[in-house]
Amino acid sequence: MARLVGLAMMALLVAAPARAQIDPRGALLERTGWDAITAGQGAAAAKAFREALAADPKNARLHLGAGLAATLERRDEDAKDEFERALVLDAKLTRARALLGEVLYRLGDLSEAIRTYETLTADSPEDRDAQATLERWRREADLHDRMQRAIGSHFTVSFEGPAEAELAAQALESLDRAYWRIGPLLGVYPSDPIPVVLYTSEQFRDITRSPSWAAGAYDGTIRVPMRGALDKGTELDRVLAHEFTHALIRTLASRNVPTWLNEGLATALETGDLDWAQQQIREAGAAAPLRALQSGFGRFTGDQAKVAYATSAIVVRRMLDEAGGVAVANLLRDLGEGADFNSAFLHRMQRSFEEFW
Ligand SMILES: [Zn+2]
């Protein structure tokens, strides 16, 4: 028996290099693809895996790589297709199943995401993170099942009980005001109703896992913790306008948008008044360097976040003042289509970014 195992091992050891000899180019492409994933370079990874798959279309690992590349580029539908393909070829590729669940969740298909994680946790009972994610999603599904909905022409607002019905009606009115204020400014009018969910603070932290300073979140659904917003109508307007702007930005560009531009536009269009932002930067001594504001702000402490939002808002306010909302919207469209930031900026703002800021 030991000998047989030994022989089987030998066969495996021999098989790997033999395969590489048959297709060294494929092995090299795959290596390039994984290196690009590690470096966060979605486009380069997508290209490498696409070429590798052309020669070896039934390789589950290559489909996993192609899916990860698509995830990095925020092409969630493509990522879903690739992870599903990987799992058809190799049902035990648990990494693909974990990523498929995440992408389904991002696409708003909570029930399918839950089903995927039920299979994942049955296959890998030792995976505590997957178990915790599954439980969180189940709590979200239970909560959403319990919720009622207020339907407007551009938004649907979900809320938990009759006590929140009045607030939901106020939220709908506030969202409609934001729609007719910000839509014309950017020249964007989403046709499909945007889902909005009102949470308690605890539900909000649990479901979005946002930092404690966050007043709202947008991930395809506008999610807002209502406590506190209740007593102050202006705060409700501010938070909903901010998250609605994120929804507009998503319709213009689902990817490639630097965080300072995304958050800056949402913050600049909250109320229009940016005196607080100037004040914030004066107090901090300096604006935040934009290169530190390219990706998510979730890692910042409350004070760092304030300067990050203030800086972003002031930069985007200047863009709006100089070139107008439609030019900023066109810049976002170009970025979403994969354009290089500096060239797109020069084209739409009529001067180089370096000269601008
Ligand atoms: Zn935001």
Model-derived segments and their meaning:
Residues 21-38, 43, 51, 58-59, ...:
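Beta/coil-rich, acidic/histidine-enriched accessory regions frequently appended to metallopeptidases
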Residues 146-258, 269-277, 283-308, 312, ...:
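Juxtacatalytic substrate-recognition/specificity segment
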